[in-house]
Amino acid sequence: LQPIDIGHPKYLALIDPDTAFWSLVKPNKLAGVLAGDDELLRTYRKKSARFAEEMQMLRFGLKPSAVYFNPTDRCNLNCTYCYIPEKMRSSGRHMSRKRLLEALRRLRDYFRRTVPKGSLPQIVFHGAEPLLNRDAVFAGIEEYGEDFRFGVQTNATLLDDETVEFLTSRHVSIGISLDAATAAVANRTRKNWAGEGIFSQVLEAMERLRGYDAWSVICTVTSENMRHLTRMVEFFHAREVPTCLMNIIRCTLPGARTVKPSDAPAAKHFIAALDRTYELYRQSGRKLPVANFSNILLAIVAPTARRLMCDISPCGGGRCFFALATNGDMFPCSEFIGLKKFRGGNLFKHQVEDVLDTEAFRLVTQRKVEDISPCNRCTIRHFCGSPCPAEAYEMNGGMDRTGAFCEFYEEQVRYAFRLIADGKEDAFLWDGWDKGTIDTFVAP
């Protein structure tokens, strides 16, 4: 067990880096615990093998249950940080209705072989902008509504009344994007090909979605908007957004690196925004979970209950989900679309199982923190996972390199432990997050 300073006045965290077991310890008790004079260490040792097995299963024993499905290469926006190459977005192709239905049939047949009965795999129509190919997407949702849980990730510019009615009536999850609470900031990085911002269109879509329980908003944290994150969560809360994400920018392609923030200020503003969500909850009784941070909390308090798989190694790419390009090419994750080295095969030509076992996929599914320096010496490595492999490869030159950020993730974990020490963690998690979980360790 290794101690880390979490910045709390009363507690340190003791962590086993290999199993992600942890405990909060008062500094004056630390020496006794480490010397074995405390019941905590003796009790932990009795169960450490079980914790190791759980971590092994979480990291290496899962199979895909979701697909990020690009029904078109094209987008009506030209956002600064997009990970899809500009040429694809400006002049790419749509997947035909017939081809899209065939792809869903093949995916259904694959998941019937692998997903336990009673569980539905997930298809997220992603992009680029999937609603540019709306008719084909809607045909797929109609045809295979009993076989998949569907979602759509959209820039919201095409979410008119008819589209919202179709999606909400079929309980399709809807994710939209907005980077700030004012047009002046939001339009800096998210704009159309003419350079015009889309802030007002997104607000109109948010009003159409108000009251629906299955929508969320992604805010990408950049150097352009990080100082406005507190205002952002106030804006989301006032508009009754059920869940948001404040994802630190992925720096896979050069354009994104032009708006990359430094770790320390990004962490400072991010944590200030999280503090504000707690204040809003205390004032209103209504939570605003910031899902990417909620996932960090879950990684600590209930590792196997986490919903997102970017903050563990290997990440979820190629082992919990994979991405499908418009021409049927398969990639471990959407971040790799446009990087030919990571094309594993084609859905229309190859068996999914065979693609998952290709070298292109193994580059991602076998990337682990134990092989990355300095991550292999980091106490919190299983609460972070050294994301993202796409940016590690493209930005820093190899899969054995770190991604674009380090301190940012460290500060998130320290903050999460402080919340746990103060008994506040439930305010940052979804209602019912612990349904179906069991206690595997209770501190003596």
Predicted regions and their residues:
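A broadly conserved sequence feature marking short terminus-proximal activation segments
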Residues: 32-49, 324-356, 362
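Residue-level structural signal for beta-strand termini and adjacent loop
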Residues: 27-28, 136, 336
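Canonical Radical SAM [4Fe-4S] cluster-binding loop centered on the CxxxCxxC motif
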Residues: 62-99
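Conserved, mostly hydrophobic/aromatic
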Residues: 75, 79, 125, 152, ...
